Structures are given as C-alpha cells and as structure tokens.
Amino acid sequence: MGSLRFTQENQNILFIGTSGVGKTHLATAIGIEGCKQGISTQFIRCSDLINKLQTAQVQGRSEEVLRRYARFQILIIDEIGYLPIESVGAKLFFQLIERRYERKSTIITTNIPPSKWGNTFSDKMLANAILDRLVHHAKVIRITGRSYRMKDHLIEKKDNSGPDLSGFSSQNKERSSETL
C-alpha cells in the first residue's frame, strides 16, 4: 500500500463488506498515506457529499463544488448505500464520477453489493452508469467476516437479557482482503 501505485494509474478501489469489517479503516489508512506522500486527498461520507452537491445546486454553485471534488487525486467516498440517493443527488453524483473517470482515483466503501446499487440510486440506469465508471479501472476488494465493533461483547449471557450476540466471537478468522 505504501507506493499507492493505483493513483498513478488513476485506478479506483471499491471496498465491499458488511458493517464493521474495516472498510472505512482501510480507506482512511490509504488516505493518510496519500497525505503523507503529498497526494491531494479528501474523505467524505456519501450522504454529506450528496447534501453538499444538492445545496450547491440550489445556490447556483454546483459547477464550483463539482470542480472542487473532481480535483483531488484521491477522493474517498464512505458509506454508499446506507441511505437512498434521490434523483437530483444521483445525477450530481454521476457528474462527479464522470469528471473523475480515468483522471483521478476514487475509493468507495459500501455494504451494498454492486448488483443492488439500483436500489440505492433512484434510477437504475444511472446506477449502472456510475458503477460502470467506478469498476472499469478498479480493484474490487470484498471483505468478509464479523464486525470488529462487536468482537469484545460477550457471546453468552446467562440471564438471557440483552441482545443476542451469539453470532459474534472475540476471534475473527473469516477476514479476507486483497493486498493493495
């Protein structure tokens, strides 16, 4: 990961996996390394990005904001799919991805498999166009396993009170990821 060669080739990275498996942690680590190497880097949650793009459009500043996010060599967009993206937001998001396509590197974290992105974006054709541009020059990394956040919780409760955490263990042997 130290070389960040993917940025020289304007490749993208998609981290796909359930909540708590380390997608954001890995994306953040890449972003920090990018900053250390002097690479322009921005991290933003998808919902915040969509809100900023929509607000800018209402204020007549969408071009300015799209240009701003298009210029970063590494743009990390966290948590695509946690909240639905309505038509206006989806169109603005597409414009941003189109501007970055084959010019800059975008890192995406999502808990939604690409086949379900049509449910996240209000327009399935637009979702396909976005996904097509993101995965064309991308390393797609699927991370499996159990949530790091739940690993320290007890798996057995003698009094049967509280949530059932029997599906979680303190050791996670199912993790897998690809070396960048």
What kind of region is each of these model predictions?
Residues 1-71, 120:
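Conserved P-loop
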Residues 74:
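Walker B motif beta-strand of ABC-family P-loop ATPases
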